[in-house]
A protein has these predicted regions:
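Short, flexible loop/hinge motifs at secondary-structure junctions
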Residues: 1-181, 223-224, 253-254, 393-396, ...
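Catalytic center-proximal scaffold of phosphoryl-transfer enzymes
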Residues: 2-3, 8, 101, 158-542
Length: 542
């Protein structure tokens, strides 16, 4: 801040000194105005995230413009007049007949006693004998019954020798291996707990309360112990086998989200992270999701996970991933276009909607339109084989991408927007990430963005809003293992509860004499295995 001058000092200044003072004040005023505009933009963005729609689609951003300025904002004289076929409504698709029967066909049925009409009532209404019985009407309703509890009583026959070589020796019937020795927990009970906590994102204290309402007293501490012990004994080797499958794929995707673990931090309230690694979005045959708990998100974490990997890793712009390109010769990092457009979307959301034409003419809005065209074309190509998708990308999208980067560099060079504004930050981000953002043009199996990873980690993000934190690192690692199985099961169109129940029934059979499991022997239990029982599979609606 410059010194304040008194009236007497200004009167005594020379012409050159006055010019210097005015120019200096103009510079200060420009800086202040720029800071004020940036602060206003930040407030609008914060309000948008807090109160507005949590979406970055161009249509939703357009929808925030003033209703009374709709004609001006939507006017585009270059748009051709639509044909009659585009204007006239298409014939309405009526609901398919028999759909209810199809939806209900796999459920057990119970025929209830018929609702009868007595002979006396018939004679009174029609007159004696003036009636005959027609075909009965039937209809179906779906009934739900709360979960039931059954105590399993297992009986083991015991014999003792009374003579011969084995006198006084005991012989017992061969009993199945317990899930946890000496515990009342069964595969069905633990599967139910896992389904409620990790699939439906409910906290264990709510499960405990629901159990108590049904007269079952199982504390959340007991449930936590069951989860951790089974995760360490059974799920760890199981997920190791899934990880082997993931790292054999040519394209993977990764993301991370903060979480709080009370007992695993040197500093109170410091952030730990849950990482998610998944198969490429276009890999539909055996999709895999691996969760991994880590204390931080420095580059050593993904470096260790992908140390022996050879392929393309799709991520956001986190610098830690970019280091993998340099330290791991087999890894190529591809960036996410959804992150590239985020700053521009924020800028448009924060713009003054009283002047929609200026918003549409803004650099941020034009950038969004250009990126939206990439997405529009790429969406059309999703069902194509990878080779055809690559050909189409090279022909139709690559020229648009090259034009986009040339346009971005021109805007940055002309300094049309303040560098510290969201638009300025967006331009700077795109320029610095150019090489990473172009990688999807080199392989048809590389997705245009990392949205699949964000979807894979969403269940965890919903869950942590309910249970807030983990108490221990053991609990966090156990959660990572369970989420890996449940999310992979969902991607493979399995029903998580039935799948958990099945593998918890089978996994004890794979333990050797020391209680260890060889991951190489678990192929027939994997979520994509053809040997899985039909009840594990999600019914397909016709």
């Amino acid at each position: 801040m410059a010194d304040r001058h008194t009236l007497e000092e200004l009167n005594n200044c020379s012409r050159e000194e006055l010019i210097t003072i005015v120019l200096m004040m103009q510079g200060q005023l420009d800086t202040l105005n720029e800071n004020i505009e940036r602060l206003i933009e930040q407030v609008r963005i914060a309000n948008s995230y807090r109160f507005g729609k949590h979406t970055e689609t161009l249509d939703s951003i357009d929808g925030q413009m003033s209703f009374f300025d709709e004609a001006e904002s939507c006017c585009d004289l270059s748009v051709p007049e639509p044909a009659a076929e585009e204007v006239l409504p298409s014939r309405r698709n009526h609901k398919k007949k028999g759909q209810r029967e199809t939806d209900l066909k796999d459920f057990p049925e119970e025929i209830l006693p018929p609702y009868q009409v007595s002979t006396e009532e018939l004679d009174t209404f029609y007159g004696a004998g003036n009636w005959r019985r027609m075909k009965d009407e039937t209809y179906k309703r779906l009934r739900h019954e709360p979960e039931s509890w059954t105590v399993e009583i297992h009986t083991v026959e015991v014999y003792v020798g009374t003579g011969g070589d084995h006198q006084d020796e005991f012989l017992r019937g061969k009993r199945p291996k317990d899930l946890l020795r000496g515990s009342i927990v069964t595969p069905s009970l633990l599967a139910s707990i896992l389904n409620v906590k990790y699939v439906n994102s409910s906290a264990l204290h709510r499960v405990e309360q629901e159990f108590q309402r049904n007269g079952v007293n199982i504390s959340r501490q007991t449930m936590s112990n069951w989860i951790i012990r089974c995760a360490e004994k059974y799920f760890a080797p199981f997920v190791d086998r899934m990880k082997q499958e993931l790292l054999s794929l040519p394209v993977t995707q990764s993301d991370e989200t903060p979480t709080q673990v009370i007992g695993d931090s040197d500093r109170p309230n410091s952030k730990c992270y849950m990482w998610v690694h998944r198969s490429g979005e276009f890999y539909k045959e055996r999709p895999v999701v691996i969760y991994e708990y880590q204390k931080g998100r420095d580059h050593e974490k993904p470096l260790e996970f992908y140390r022996n990997y050879k392929g393309v890793l799709v991520t956001d712009s986190l610098a830690q991933y970019h280091l993998l390109d340099k330290k791991l010769p087999g890894v190529t990092n591809a960036n996410c276009w959804a992150h590239a457009r985020r700053a521009f979307a924020d800028a448009v959301k924060a713009a003054d909607k009283k002047d929609p034409l200026s918003v549409k003419n803004s650099v941020a809005y034009q950038a969004l339109q250009k990126i939206a065209e990439f997405y529009r074309i790429d969406t059309e190509l999703k069902e194509l084989p990878a080779t055809d998708r690559l050909t189409q990308r090279q022909t139709r999208i690559k020229p648009l991408v090259e034009d986009f980067f040339a346009w971005v560099k021109q805007q940055a060079a002309e300094c049309t927007v303040p560098p510290k504004s969201r638009t300025g930050q967006g331009l700077n981000f795109v320029i610095h990430q150019e090489n990473y953002l172009k990688v999807f043009l080199t392989d048809g199996d590389i997705p245009i963005d990392n949205s699949a990873s964000e979807r894979a980690i969403r269940t965890f993000c919903i869950g942590k809003k309910n249970w807030m934190f983990h108490n221990t690192a053991k609990g966090a690692r156990a959660s990572a293992l369970v989420y890996s199985i449940s999310e992979t099961a969902k991607l493979n169109n399995l029903r998580p509860y039935y799948y958990f129940r099945y593998i918890l029934t089978e996994l004890p059979k794979y333990c050797d004499e020391k209680g260890n499991i060889n991951p190489a022997k678990l192929d027939q239990l994997m979520p994509w295995a053809e040997e899985l029982p039909e009840e594990c599979r999600k019914p397909r609606r016709s």
